[in-house]
């Protein structure tokens, strides 16, 4: 089930994004990015619709994924 990111408080959204970024592991790119930069990138992706917040009833968890990978 999709969760509209706009319905979350700014603090809750920030915490969800930080948790997601920290779970994603190490960035092996040419330049290391700060947590703040990664959080800003994910927030931008949510705002422009490239990424979505998804609630899993089975696992009772929230995840962030590319919109193209989401299937209802």
Swiss-Prot record:
Protein name: UPF0270 protein YheU
Cross-referenced Gene3D superfamilies: YehU-like (1.10.10.610)
InterPro entries in alphabetical order: UPF0270, YehU-like_sf
Coiled coil residues, start to end: none
Organism: Escherichia coli O139:H28 (strain E24377A / ETEC)
First and last residue of the signal peptide: none
Pfam families referenced in this protein's UniProt entry, alphabetically: UPF0270 (PF06794)
Gene that this polypeptide is encoded by: yheU
Family (UniProt): Belongs to the UPF0270 family.
């Amino acid at each position: 089930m999709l969760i509209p990111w706009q319905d979350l408080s700014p603090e809750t959204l920030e915490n969800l994004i930080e948790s997601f970024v920290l779970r994603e592991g190490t960035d092996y790119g040419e330049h290391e990015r700060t947590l703040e930069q990664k959080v800003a990138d994910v927030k931008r992706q949510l705002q422009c619709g490239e990424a979505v917040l998804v609630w899993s009833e089975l696992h009772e968890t929230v995840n962030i994924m590319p919109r193209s990978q989401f299937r209802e």
